[in-house]
Amino acid sequence: NKGSGFVKLVDKDSGHEKTVSFLPETYELSVEDFNPNGINGKPYAGLYRTGGRALDLKTNWLDGGAMNNSSYEGVAVSTEGEAYESVRLRSVDKPQEILSRSGWIAFVQKYFFAALLGSKDYIYNYYVLPENSGVYRMGYTVESSIDGGMVYGHKHRLFVGPKVRKDLMQRSDNLELAIDM
């Protein structure tokens, strides 16, 4: 199902729906999960990436690619207790978790990043996992006071784009700190 500015994916067997919408703010998406029957468990969102680099990335000194050889690639998290914490992807050697109301978690690079943006309405368990078969993973689960309760839906926000300070300051607390990694 497709509309103006959104795509809806439906699993006819389970009734699960996923609607991906482009928000008015550039570089930001809303991903809404909904199941009319409910699902046992916690809402979650996760991003995956490899350690690979763009095929057109210059790395040869003579071609002007010296800076790209040491370009920072990591994961960053912002929580109510820590405004900004970052670690290089290759330094993540064990699973890491932190609980926080609001905040965000992101894969960061020198000029661009992809961030899952939390809401002040929920408590998140942000996680980062070490590399497994060439893939890095990070994301969150949404915590609930109702243990084992049914979940019918959740809306996630995803930012994928450039690090422009004035733009990032309007999206989420401390998001602009990813610029000064």
Residues of each region from the PLM?
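Soluble non-transmembrane domains of integral membrane proteins
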Residues: 1-180
